[in-house]
Amino acid sequence: MADFMDIEPSSHSAKASQYESSAPASSSLGNSHPNESLDYYIYDYFVKHNFEEAAQAFLRESKIQIPKSSSSTAFSPSNNNAPSPFPPKNSSLASPSKISESISGDRLYNHMSSAPSPNKKEETNVVHANEDISLDKRQSFGSSSLPPSEVSINVPEGFLVEWFNIFWDVFSARVSRVNSTPIQLYDPSTQRQMARPMSNLQASQPVPSSTFSRSAVVPNPSLPLNPSVLQGQVMNNPTIPKGTPSTSIEGAKTSIPPSHAMQNPHNSFPASADRLQKNHPVQSSNFNPYTPAPSITVPPNYIPNTAMMGPSYSSFGDTDPRTYPAGMGPNPTAARNGFYPPTPAQIHQLKAQQQHLQRQSKQMSEPAPINMKSNKDQQLQYVDFRGVGSGADLQKQQWNKSTSAEGLQPNGLVMRNFGDVRHQKLPTSSPPSQHPPVGQIPSQYLPYQAGLKVPGNTPIPVKQVGGMPLQSPLPVSMKPSADDHSRATPTRSVEAPTLPSYAPRHPTQANGSRYMNPSTSRMTPQSPYMQNYYRPHAQMQDQNNMMSYMLSQQKAMEIAKSREMAIQRNTQTLSSGNQPPQQSGPNPNEFSMSMDPANMQQGNHALSDYHMQLMLLEEQNKKRLMMARQEQGTGSLSPQSYMNSRYSVDVGKEHMSMIPNQTAPMIQPNVPVSANSPAQANTPAADSTKSGTIQPTNRNGEGLSYSPHQQFSPSAPQAEKLSRSMSPFVSQQQQLNQPVSNKPDGLTQNKEVTGMPLNKEELTNPAFPQSRTSWMMPQSFDTSSLNAPGAKDSSSFSSLHAQPGKSGIATMGVADNTIRTTERSTFSEIMKDSPSAHASPGAKTSPNASRAPEPTGGTNSISQDTTQSLQMQSNSVNSSSMVDASKSKEKSGGDTSALDSNAKNEPTAAKPISKLEDDALFNDSAGNAFGFSSKTDSNVEMLNDFDFESFLNDAGADSASVYY
């Protein structure tokens, strides 16, 4: 059976009816089982192929019955009657001549090239693959002495061979995908019919190439070779000689290289193929499908694109990767690597590609004209803009005349809308005109280069040239120059378009630093319905942008100038000591000098507003600083004096408790108190000072009262009120420690600022600034002499600041002379820092032996460090003359321990104050319970570092934090 695997008689099935016998089959054959019918066909196969021994053995062992016939050859098997070897006379089988003709027409042959027949005696009846099936050999079928069997399908070679051929065609198509000969015979006929219109089109449009190239035969190497397409291309190409053997059309009908054909001689076609071709109904007279293909059609190194050659075996559900040596494959592994027939989709794709190649070749040989159909819209078909910037007007006119007479081209595209560029296409070739130089943009691209958006509702003037309307890319009378763009005005005209010989650059590209490459920035043609397609609009846009930029620059310069002038005015005002006038309008200083016009154009308002707020805050701080300086120069209130006026009277009127479990007498402000009260050096106030606790006074609705046994509670309303009131000033104590000014009246200034008690001469002296009554602060009085002789236990003064972690009750009472003396002893520090108090910066004062040591144990550190009260009264220094005496004594090396009690921790004996003086100063009043004083309050330079912003913004009853 293996010898017949290469037989491809798929066309036998179509001719099977010609060999069917009309004789009635035997009853045993008609009513027998299919297995018995198969036995009859097997026996028929043995008989027709002269397998006598096999047929006799099979006849003895099988159950078939052969009918007897008198005209049959003598054959009497032992167990069967010999039937007639020929069919009955009434059989409608074809005559041997008809059978021979049909067999030769159907190209039936057996592939039994090497295997001999089992019966070597009848070897002459064997039909080889390369031999012709002649009539003599066909008549030898059935000439053996074996009786023939009566079968329903009686064919010369037997039904078994026919059935196996059909099965093998299906099986090989299922597993191998190899081109078979019937497919190769059928496919060219259909392809030829499909390619006939294409060939006619090619004949009317000759190829411009003067020499034959391989691309004319094989359009795309990635696609499978189509013999009919190649035939049409070669036949319709006038440049190819008819007798060229390398381009012979017979070689285009197979895809097997000659090398493979030589390697597989047994797969070659039979020698009688020309005679079979003559009888085939679908073959042409000049076509030989069995001629080997030349090397130019299929190169030896050609690798087909299997992705485009039909589906793979996996698309049919076949997962078997094995290959089968079958059919017309170039080699045994041709099942996977062979050439597949083109599918209808590939044929359509190849046809479309061929049309594209034709259009492209025509475009390369001829310039693309402007063709217009005479329809209602007069639509623009094709426009080439690549020669408008070179000045070759004469050549363009000649070119338009020559191309306008050719009519509508197949590649012309209709352009309805100027803005719709999705279906537009530029030609691949340019008219015979010079291109603009590199770096120079053609004039028709300037509107796009300038970013101009062109509406699509105004037509462009059209010129009739040679009977064809030509669309002008620019207005006719538009002749711009490099310097004057205003002359490019839109007008309508019917004259021939005159284009400039140069292409002016965009205004932003005057220096040639950057440009748009014409090859990459070529704009597509647009519809005739276009409005304002002129450069002046791009110029107007550029002018508007330039004008806005110049205005923004001018505005920024004006703001900078106004700011500079305002700074100069403020500087002059500060140098003259006058207060600058308040501005009624918007302050130009609030604008930033660094405002970028780009930010203004882009609308970055948040950043500019934030910057303006910062500038406004800075100006406000400067104004506050200038006001503070003016207040110091004119005798206005300082922050300490303001707080003195706020708290001195109220605190002086408060009733303070001294120690726990002891009642203090009620002290009214209008009760006369002796000024010569003895000082209580060892009062219980020292203990309360050591304890570091505080008991704030609560205020009832009926009047002034106190609670001697009430412990300190941070949640007390009055404590919160006092803490909030004192918070902004306690935080500023370290900033106020600056050297004392070296002004001659530094002592007077210190008295004013730090709260030194004034005498009557100073209060009544018009030259002293504090003698003038302020509208914010009434004159306070010194309550240091309120200690009556019987008020020993009620003259204690305690610190306001509580030490955390310690218990006890600290009372607020009338200022004690001992504590006051301790506070006043620190005034010597002012004299040490003052240039007028000592000769050298390193000079120190000697301790005063007459002063008692200060309390050391539990004294609050804030009272010693931050409370810098003047101690002039305790040392009998109550006037400027005494201060001068103290200075002279200090210079002479005398005892100055009274002025520097901080050198030793010894308590100083308090000296009674002679009388009660109403004083608005802070330190020496009964309201000086917080110690808001500094030795540098009179320094003018202190105001430069003073944080007025926090002073003005944080002060108030809502301040919740206390700064220790």
From Swiss-Prot:
Region (Disordered): 1-32, 69-125, 241-273, 476-523, 572-596, 664-914
GO molecular function: DNA-binding transcription factor activity, RNA polymerase II-specific; RNA polymerase II cis-regulatory region sequence-specific DNA binding
Domain (LisH) ranges: 34-66
One GO biological process term: positive regulation of transcription by RNA polymerase II
Residue stretches of biased makeup (Low complexity): 16-32, 69-83, 575-589, 869-885
Ranges of compositional bias, category Polar residues: 93-103, 261-270, 508-523, 664-700, 707-716, 724-752, 767-801, 818-828, 857-868, 894-905
Family statement drawn from the similarity comment of this UniProt entry: Belongs to the FLO8 family.
Known function: Probable transcriptional regulator involved in cell adhesion.
Keywords linked to the UniProt accession: Cell adhesion, Cytoplasm, Nucleus, Phosphoprotein, Transcription, Transcription regulation
SMART domains registered for this protein in UniProt: LisH
Source organism (scientific name): Schizosaccharomyces pombe (strain 972 / ATCC 24843) (Fission yeast)
Protein name per its UniProtKB record: Adhesion defective protein 3
One GO cellular component term noted in the UniProt record for this chain: cytoplasm
Keyword Protein transport on entry: no
Keyword Repeat in annotation: no
InterPro entries to which the protein is assigned, alphabetical: LisH
Domain of life (superkingdom): Eukaryota
Locations listed in the record: Cytoplasm; Nucleus
